[in-house]
A protein has these predicted regions:
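Secretory/exported precursors with cleavable N-terminal leaders
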Residues: 2-395
Length: 395
């Protein structure tokens, strides 16, 4: 089976009726990832969950059209730092230009944004020009009085941008007379493990959901040189699996105790992923991780408000005057986040290889053992960004 990582975030911006100093922009994705994951963990029930901090990119575009308190909150909580919006846009475009051009290095990413506008509303031309130049965003008009045609148009575009992994996401009910702008941000990620897992070593084993409950699922295994660490502070093991021809890795953080995930995530709320990754060194490791798939759908409005982004969601408080030609009250009423993750022996959306050689497992008493047979945290990252972060709790 092919494997794919696909991130999709959709912001619905309907019409409502009736300068902080921060860390550098280059550091903001790492810190934002920590803050978002921490806020989300406070709200969601204990189920498989995954989120992409690339959500910050969609909200940065909202920041470009925001004013007053709305802009101040977004600047502060997105950790944009620079008060000049043109500099924010320029630096943002430069950082993502490097990331999205890495296909030749073994990892492929596609990050695209599109604005869908009720044809009764008009977007400022300067905002639209900026969105296209710096955010790879395009604006398109829709007739919300004809929701069937509108939903077909949007769903068709989403399918194409996600290589047909996301289908029929929207329903006609989304396009109603109260809606004004739909901002869609899509991140597609595809990669192959630097060292794939031998198929013949994948076996069905127990996965402990808690000390009293277990389920069977396929567990992949291999032995190799990987970045590995043990943290007394986190009471966890740390493992980084690299992707082929890339500086990106999938990091696993495995609590020592079967029921240690909650305490681990509480401690992780005080650290960023770079700090965690720094605790690992190259070691020979016997690795066993589950073959798993996550489909996660999250309402981001609650965690974003918990982080302090409130004004843009509140009627009579939101200021999006930089988006529309006419001055009228607007607010973001809903934020949906949908993501898919499929982890296999080969990586991400990579077909099985016919020339994979069997692996002989030799004994080595100095070898570290990393067996993820209980709930764990994972992150797909490099030193500059956290692209996905989540936890796996049960099959």
């Amino acid at each position: 089976m092919p494997s794919e990582w696909v991130f999709l975030i959709i912001w619905l911006i309907p019409m409502a009726s009736g300068g902080t100093t921060a860390p550098s922009l280059s550091a903001s994705p790492i810190v934002f990832a920590r803050n978002l994951f921490r806020a989300l963990n406070d709200e969601v029930p204990p189920v498989n969950m995954m989120v992409s901090p690339a959500a910050a990119r969609a909200m940065t575009l909202v920041f470009m059209g925001a004013g007053g308190k709305s802009a101040d909150e977004l600047r502060s909580k997105l950790i944009l730092g620079v008060s000049n919006k043109s500099e924010v846009a320029k630096q943002h475009a430069e950082s993502w230009s490097d990331e999205c051009s890495c296909a030749k290095r073994g990892v492929a990413m596609r990050l695209v944004t599109r604005l869908y506008v009720n044809e009764e509303e008009k977007i400022r031309t300067d905002f639209n020009s900026m969105a296209l130049e710096f955010f790879n965003a395009e604006a398109d008009s829709l007739n919300y009085l004809n929701p069937e045609d509108s939903v077909k148009k949007v769903n068709k575009w989403l399918e194409k941008q996600t290589f047909y992994t996301v289908r029929n996401l929207f329903t006609p009910e989304v396009f109603n007379p109260d809606a004004s702008v739909i901002l869609v941000n899509s991140l597609f990620f595809r990669a192959k493990w630097d060292k794939i897992f031998p198929l013949q070593l994948t076996k069905v084993e127990d996965f402990w959901i808690n000390p009293r409950q277990r389920m069977e699922l396929p567990m992949m295994r291999q032995i190799g040189q990987f970045r590995y660490g043990e943290s007394k502070k986190l009471k966890s093991q740390i493992l980084q699996l690299p992707f082929e021809m890339s500086n990106m890795t999938m990091m696993f953080i495995l609590p020592t105790a079967i029921d240690g995930l909650a305490k681990l995530e509480e401690r992780l709320g005080q650290l960023d992923m770079n700090e965690v990754a720094a605790r690992s060194l190259m070691k020979e490791v016997d690795v066993t991780i589950p073959k798993f798939r996550i489909e996660s759908s999250v309402d981001l409005k609650v965690p974003l408000q918990k982080m302090g982004i409130n004004s843009v969601f509140e009627a009579g408080q939101a200021n999006l005057s930089g988006v529309f030609e006419k001055k009228s009250p607007q607010r973001i009423s809903e934020a949906r986040h949908k993501v898919f993750l499929n982890v296999t022996e080969f990586g991400c959306e990579v077909a099985p290889e016919s020339d994979v050689q069997p692996e002989v497992l030799k004994k080595n008493h100095d070898r570290k053992v990393f067996k993820a047979d209980r709930p764990f945290v994972f992150a797909i990252r490099d030193k500059k960004n956290v692209y996905f972060v989540g936890h796996f709790i049960k099959p």
